[in-house]
Amino acid sequence: MNFSKRKSNFSILSVFATRLGVAALIIAALPGLTNSIARASGAGLDVEVPFEIKALKAPGLVAPYFVQDNHGTMVVSDQAGGVYSVTFAGKATALADKTKIKNPAGVAVGPAGFGSYEGSVFVLAAAGGIKGVCEVERIDKSGAVSTFAKLPDAAATECRDLEFGAANSPFAGKLYAVASGNDSIYTIDASGKASVFGTYTKPVPFELTTITFPPSSDTKAAGMMLVGMRAKGSFAAKVGRIAMVGADGKMKDEVYLVGFIRPSGFAWSPSTFGSYSDELLIADTGKFASENDNMRDGVIVRVEKDLARPFASGLMDPTDMKFIGSKAVICDPAEKGKGQGAIVIISSML
């Protein structure tokens, strides 16, 4: 990937965004990564040294979509159907196969204090067809699947992320579901009651991708929910943004960061992540592979002192990213082509 061109695009956006009174994302000029010794053999994946990147082989998993940590093991939804427990050795075990959950999206693991559901796996899934109404399914420890919550007033939607609110925050004790087709986020309590948390159609309707909660040390967004979004129907390249939403469900006028194509996952690195500990990493899907002749324009950037620096490139359609232990875990449902995805792992070599 030519990051010098990317720098130019972000710089132009910076001027434009400054005039609009929003925080633009500026990408720093760094050496290209294409000659990195950390390139994944034969995969097109590349990451800054001294990190390594690889596509994990997990037989049985077709198109990884969303991921969640379950005590060091990955819980992964598959666009081809089903939800799996996946080890870092690549062993995939069906928690619920595609006959039980046909169209899964976001996944979440019940924390202590969420009713009697600690350890249960929750899945945001489309009922019926892929464009069907989003519901929250629960997989109990025996593998039984039941409908936990139905989203109110949810017409045909596009199911996306599902996250529990951060502990010791205004969002604690609730489950949050993203339905992009409705431009809405829903909140669900331990009884399964769901209500609209916020709908985001102004100044334009937004495609919603993912949500997360910043650490308390983040002075800009402490106590907020961060939401990845992109204006629907927009032809401009770099209008994707990370918005700040308060506990009242209202989106702040000031954005957290802007300058992406489609921000699809973001997380703060742990102290064990080599020389880049405690930094914000952001996955940008770019254009979908089906829209740009399978161009590998998916990237990971890291934010250091308000500068976004290129970190990894060569991904196809990254749709989610989490840190599990000391590793960055990225779902890419088209990493090897349409319907041929992979879990991409980035690790420090230090």
Task: Locate each region found by the language model.
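Short loop/turn segments immediately following the C-termini of beta-strands
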Residues: 78-79, 125-128, 179-181, 216, ...
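Bacterial N-terminal signal peptides
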Residues: 17-32
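N-terminal secretory signal peptides that target proteins for export/translocation
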Residues: 1-16
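A short loop-to-beta-strand structural motif that recurs across blades of beta-propeller domains
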Residues: 82-85, 133-137, 183-187, 238-243, ...
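Beta-rich, blade/repeat-based domains predominating
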Residues: 59-72, 100-120, 133, 153-174, ...
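A short beta-strand motif characteristic of beta-propeller blades
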Residues: 49-59, 91-98, 144-153, 193-201, ...
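Short loop/turn segments that connect beta-strands within beta-propeller blades
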Residues: 86-91, 139-144, 188-193, 245-250, ...
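Blade/loop signatures of beta-propeller domains
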Residues: 40-49
